[in-house]
Structures are given as structure tokens and as C-alpha cells.
């Protein structure tokens, strides 16, 4: 935990409600999100009990499995879930655009992409496991299943994989999204409770955040947000209701038992459902960060590519081989670096973390030379000088290059340091002439920020060894076998 994060939590305790740690929203919020609140059977990794799912607060579908250990009923549940999810996904495949890559190839990209919300990371993992459990089911031969079941499995697997990509917003967890924008007065572990976290952020009238969070700890008042259920509910309600379904002797009795089970599970799901939509309202009240749209464009591209693979019948790999795994890891490392830089440049509150750590600073321009030219080369270049004074704990180094926060395309080279001030030589973002464009060079009295990192790090091609130069353990060709000599054979014996 950083110093500022600890300070924000302490201030939340003092003020009695969560403190904002972001001035803008750092993830995309869809106009028509699909909210899913799943519950699973205790002790089973991918045995669904129920799910409440829908695209609006008053239009929810409740799907249940009266006997979660019955694989036939489980597949029937997944088929019903596919009837909700797949039509939602198909609406985003209608409107597309034709684009041309740098290599001259034409490709199609959807104008929008789906967004599924779950209450917490556990919900994300459960949906991914549920998808992986059925994505290879056969639709022909012995014991065939409807085509929608493995198709939903492929899509849920893709959503789960994409959710691990830093900056992606196709399958966000609500507790993670709220914690990224507010600091509560409780521990990080306690922030995993959606009701308690929302109690700090938006406490009921007459309650402090701590009081609202304490009430949220009572499973009778605020049932768990899933996918795990409360042990008391499991023992006192769920187990007897499932036993009653098992003991039913005819279809009428089973129907009554299933209805009783659905009513009970609906009571567990409804409070979390309301919390999810209230959380979406709170997030939508924040202005969107400048770089959010670019990250959503990446999500749209990933969605479009996978949809094309599904349409062409390209199989989904069971697991990554060595080279694709390396590429995936490198892409995620780059995406994480870019996400951190973009959020800092979008949000002054996020940039504070870097200012405290000495990776960035803000200062006042005390002198500006906008018309200065560098004549050291064969041709003169426009290289204005600005003198900055700062009180931030920033230790500049002569020769290092800094990026301007207000003008990300403009960099400043540290050429001189004098006490609490420094001289920067500017380049970029001023036009191509020997006279700077109006407003492109800071003037005396301007307040500016500079950082040691960029909002968009270098994103060139991933250079991996050729296949013949890759070890066989990592996808390369197997070593050539040579028969052992007589001496070597005797040693092996």
C-alpha cells in the first residue's frame, strides 16, 4: 500500500465515508451492460446453483439448478444461460466498420462490444471455469448437447481470458472497479465484500460508512455477493430444499420443490443485484478518462477477432503452447505499463502517487525562451528553453528526457539544474517550422507537470527467436537423435 493510499484510508475513517482516489473513471461503461450475479455449490468449482442476469435493473432472469450435482440439470441450466447471453452478444456483431491495416490488409471491427459485470473477481473466475467445463462438449455422436452449450463455453472462456488483460473492460469485477476509484476505511480483504464497500462509498442516510459496513457483515441482511454462499444458508435452507427436490415422487412435486428453491435463491440474489446497479450509477457519475476510449477500442478489436474465429470454425486451444504463452505474457506486461501511465496522465490524483515517489513533478515556469534555435547541427532546429521551479521531491538528472503531462507529445530534456529549478529543452508538439505554433510553448507563470514515463510506451513488434532457434521444450524442433556408441551404451547399462 502506498503512502497516499494509506492516507486516503485514514481520512475515510476520520470522515466516516470513502474518499475518492480518482478524479475520472478509468474504465469504459457500456450503455447496455449485462450484469450477472452467479452462485455455485459449496465444495464444487464449477457447479452452478443459480444466476441472476439481465441488462436493466427491472429486467432480470433468474436461472436455477434444483440439483447442482445432476449433470443433466446442469447442462440444461447452461443451455438456458446461453439463451440469454448469446443473443446479447449477437447484437454487437451487426454494426461493423471496414479498416485497413498498415500492411494493406482489410479487416472488420465491430462498432461496439459487450460488457458483462460480476460482483467480484470470484464471479469472473467462476464464469471462466463454467465456460471451460463445457466448451469442448460434442454436438454429435454419443450424448450430444445443443450447439449453444459449447458455443457459450467458448465465449465465457474468452471473456475470462480477456478479463486478465490489464485495462480490459469486457468482464470487470465491481469490487475491483469501486476500489480503483474510492478508498474505504477498511482493509483490502474487507473491500471484497460488495455490500460493505458500497456502504463506505454510499452509506444510507443517517449512517456512517463504518456503521453501514458493519450491517453489511450480517448475511441475513446482506447475503454474500457470490459465487460462494453463506454456510448458514447452505445448511438451513439450501440443503433441505435440494433434499426436498430429490425426494419428490412425481413431476408436480418436483415443480413445487423447484419453485420453493427458486424463491429462496432469488432472496439471496436480489440484494446483490440492486447493489450492482447502484454501483454502476456511481461509476457513471464520474467523467470518463481521456484514454479509456482507446482501451475500449482494443477490446472491440479483440471481440471482433474472436467472433471471426468462431464464425470460421477455428478451434479454441485447450491451453497456450510455449510461444503463444510468452506473447500473451509480454502483451500483458506492456498493457499494464501503458495502463498505469495512461491513468496517471488522465488523472491528477493518480499522478500524485508518482509525484510522491519522485517519478514526476509539477512546477511553475519562471522563464521561457520560445524562439530559441539549436544550431549545433547542419540545420537549425526549434528547441525552446523553459525554466521551471518546483517544490516536489523530484531529483532531476542532467540529460534525462521527461514527458509533459499537459502536452504528452512534447518532451523536455534536462540541460541544467539550479537548486529548486531546472532548465528544460523542449522538442515535439510545436509544429514543423522554426517558429512554434501558438500555445505550443509554455509561457511564464504556467503550471506544468513532467514525468519520467510516457502515457503510451513503445509498442513495437515482439521479437522472438525463430522456431529453429527455439529450444524444443518451448516449441522448437526436437533435437536430432543420434544412436549411442558402444561405450556410451555400456555406461547407460
For the regions a language model picked out, list residue spans one by one.
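Long, charged/polar, low-complexity intrinsically disordered N-terminal extensions
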Residues: 1-115, 126, 132-174, 233-234, ...
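Flexible loop/turn segments at secondary-structure boundaries
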Residues: 42-46, 122-127, 368-377, 395, ...
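Short aromatic-glycine-enriched beta-strand elements
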Residues: 50-51, 383-386, 422-423
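Non-catalytic nucleic-acid-binding interfaces of large nucleic-acid enzymes and RNP effectors
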Residues: 73, 81, 379-383, 417
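Extended non-globular interaction regions in eukaryotic gene-expression and organellar proteins
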Residues: 118-119, 127-135, 147-285
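Accessory interdomain/linker segments of ATP-dependent helicases and helicase-like nucleic-acid enzymes
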Residues: 255-396
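Beta-strand-rich binding/interaction modules
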Residues: 395-404
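C-terminal effector modules of nucleic-acid-centric enzymes and ribosome-associated factors
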Residues: 403-405, 411-493
Amino acid at each position: 500500500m502506498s503512502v497516499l493510499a494509506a492516507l486516503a484510508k485514514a481520512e475515510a475513517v476520520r470522515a466516516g465515508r470513502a474518499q475518492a482516489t480518482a478524479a475520472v473513471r478509468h474504465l469504459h461503461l457500456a450503455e447496455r451492460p449485462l450484469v450477472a450475479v452467479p452462485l455455485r455449490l459449496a465444495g464444487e468449482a464449477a457447479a452452478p446453483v443459480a444466476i441472476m442476469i439481465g441488462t436493466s435493473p427491472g429486467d432480470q432472469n433468474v436461472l436455477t439448478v434444483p440439483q447442482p450435482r445432476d449433470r443433466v440439470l446442469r447442462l440444461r441450466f447452461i443451455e438456458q444461460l446461453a439463451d440469454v447471453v448469446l443473443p446479447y452478444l449477437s447484437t454487437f456483431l451487426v454494426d461493423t466498420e471496414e479498416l485497413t491495416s498498415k500492411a494493406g490488409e482489410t479487416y472488420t471491427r465491430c462498432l461496439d462490444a459487450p460488457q458483462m459485470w460480476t460482483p467480484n473477481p470470484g464471479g469472473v473466475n467462476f464464469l471462466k471455469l463454467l465456460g471451460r467445463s463445457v466448451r469442448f462438449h460434442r454436438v454429435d455422436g454419443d450424448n450430444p448437447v445443443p450447439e449453444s452449450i459449447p458455443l457459450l463455453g467458448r465465449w465465457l472462456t474468452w471473456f475470462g481470458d480477456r478479463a486478465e488483460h490489464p485495462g480490459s473492460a469486457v468482464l470487470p469485477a465491481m469490487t475491483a472497479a469501486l476500489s480503483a476509484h474510492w478508498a474505504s476505511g477498511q482493509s483490502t480483504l474487507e473491500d471484497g465484500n460488495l455490500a460493505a464497500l458500497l456502504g463506505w462509498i454510499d452509506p444510507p442516510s443517517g449512517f456512517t460508512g463504518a456503521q453501514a459496513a458493519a450491517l453489511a457483515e450480517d448475511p441475513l441482511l446482506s447475503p454474500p455477493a457470490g459465487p460462494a454462499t453463506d454456510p448458514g444458508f447452505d445448511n438451513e435452507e439450501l440443503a433441505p430444499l435440494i433434499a426436498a427436490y430429490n425426494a419428490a415422487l412425481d413431476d408436480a412435486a418436483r415443480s413445487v420443490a423447484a419453485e420453493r428453491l427458486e424463491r429462496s435463491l432469488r432472496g439471496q440474489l436480489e440484494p446483490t443485484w440492486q447493489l450492482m446497479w447502484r454501483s454502476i450509477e456511481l461509476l457513471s457519475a464520474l467523467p470518463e478518462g481521456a484514454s479509456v476510449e482507446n482501451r475500449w477500442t482494443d477490446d472491440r478489436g479483440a471481440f471482433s477477432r474472436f467472433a471471426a474465429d468462431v464464425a470460421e470454425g477455428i478451434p479454441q486451444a485447450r491451453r497456450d503452447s510455449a510461444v503463444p504463452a510468452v506473447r500473451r505474457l509480454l502483451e500483458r506486461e506492456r498493457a499494464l505499463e501503458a495502463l498505469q501511465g495512461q491513468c496517471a496522465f488522465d488523472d491528477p490524483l493518480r499522478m500524485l502517487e508518482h509525484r510522491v515517489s519522485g517519478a514526476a513533478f509539477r512546477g511553475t515556469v519562471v522563464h521561457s525562451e520560445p524562439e530559441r534555435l539549436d544550431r549545433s547541427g547542419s540545420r537549425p532546429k526549434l528547441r525552446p528553453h523553459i525554466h521551471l521551479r518546483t517544490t516536489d521531491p523530484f531529483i532531476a538528472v542532467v540529460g534525462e528526457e521527461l514527458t509533459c503531462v499537459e502536452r504528452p507529445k512534447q518532451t523536455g530534456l534536462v540541460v541544467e539544474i539550479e537548486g529548486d529549478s531546472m532548465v528544460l529543452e523542449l522538442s515535439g508538439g510545436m509544429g514543423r517550422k522554426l517558429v512554434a505554433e501558438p500555445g505550443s510553448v509554455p509561457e511564464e507563470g504556467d503550471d506544468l507537470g513532467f514525468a519520467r514515463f510516457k502515457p503510451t510506451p513503445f509498442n513495437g513488434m515482439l521479437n522472438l527467436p525463430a522456431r529453429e532457434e527455439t529450444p524444443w521444450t518451448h516449441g522448437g524442433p526436437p533435437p536430432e537423435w543420434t544412436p549411442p556408441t558402444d561405450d556410451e551404451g555400456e555406461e547407460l547399462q
